[in-house]
Design a protein with these regions (language model features):
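Phosphate-handling architecture centered on phosphoinositide signaling
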Residues: 1-172
Length: 172
C-alpha cells in the first residue's frame, strides 16, 4: 500500500456487498448503505449519498448503483418506518440507472429513481394497532389490472436492510 504524504490521493470507488446468511426471504430485498443513510431514516432531513443493491427473493443480485437518498412521504415520517426516494446518479461513476424489469405490470427495463415506502397511508388517521400496510398497493394494483388508465403507481413488496440492519417490509 502506498500513501501520498501530500494527501493528493484521488478518490477511489467504494465497494459494498450484502450477504444473506440463514436469512431466507419470499420477496425481493433492497439493501442500502452509507455513512448518513440511517440518519435520514431516523428523521434527519438530509440528502446522503449511498449504495443501493436489489436482490430477488432467492438472494441473487439484480443490480446495484450509487446515488442520493432523500425524504419521501408525509404520513410515514410520523412513524419509525419512513419512506425515501433513491436517485441513481451517474456522476458517482457507477451506474446511471437500476437496469432490470423491476415491476411485473410494466415493461420498462431501467429506472433512475425509485420510491421506497412503508405504506404509511394505512396508518391514517393515526389510530394505532397493526394495519396490514397493503391498502395503497392493493388499490393501485386493481387500477392496473382493471386497465382503468388512472394516474397510478406500480409497486412490488420488498424487505429493506439499512447498513446491514433489518428495517422491515416496504414497497417500491
Amino acid at each position: 500500500i502506498v500513501y501520498d504524504k501530500l494527501n493528493n490521493n484521488l478518490p477511489s470507488f467504494v465497494e459494498t456487498n450484502t450477504y444473506f446468511i440463514n436469512s431466507p426471504h419470499t420477496v425481493n430485498v433492497i439493501s442500502i448503505a452509507g455513512d448518513q443513510v440511517d440518519n435520514l431514516l431516523n428523521g434527519n432531513q438530509i440528502k446522503p449519498i449511498g449504495s443501493f443493491e436489489i436482490f430477488d427473493s432467492e438472494g441473487v443480485l439484480i443490480d446495484e448503483a450509487t446515488g442520493e437518498f432523500n425524504e419521501h412521504g408525509n404520513d410515514s415520517w410520523a412513524y419509525q418506518q419512513r419512506g425515501f426516494d433513491y436517485i441513481t446518479r451517474d456522476q458517482h461513476g457507477y451506474n446511471y440507472a437500476i437496469k432490470d424489469d423491476l415491476f411485473r405490470e410494466k415493461n420498462r427495463e431501467e429506472y433512475q429513481r425509485l420510491i421506497v415506502k412503508a405504506a404509511a397511508n394505512d396508518n391514517y388517521p393515526f389510530t394505532g394497532g397493526s394495519p396490514a400496510h397493503i391498502r395503497d398497493s392493493y388499490i393501485q394494483s386493481l387500477s392496473q389490472v382493471g386497465n382503468l388508465r388512472l394516474d397510478e403507481r406500480s409497486h412490488e413488496s420488498c424487505v429493506l436492510y439499512v447498513n446491514g440492519d433489518y428495517w422491515g417490509v416496504y414497497d417500491y
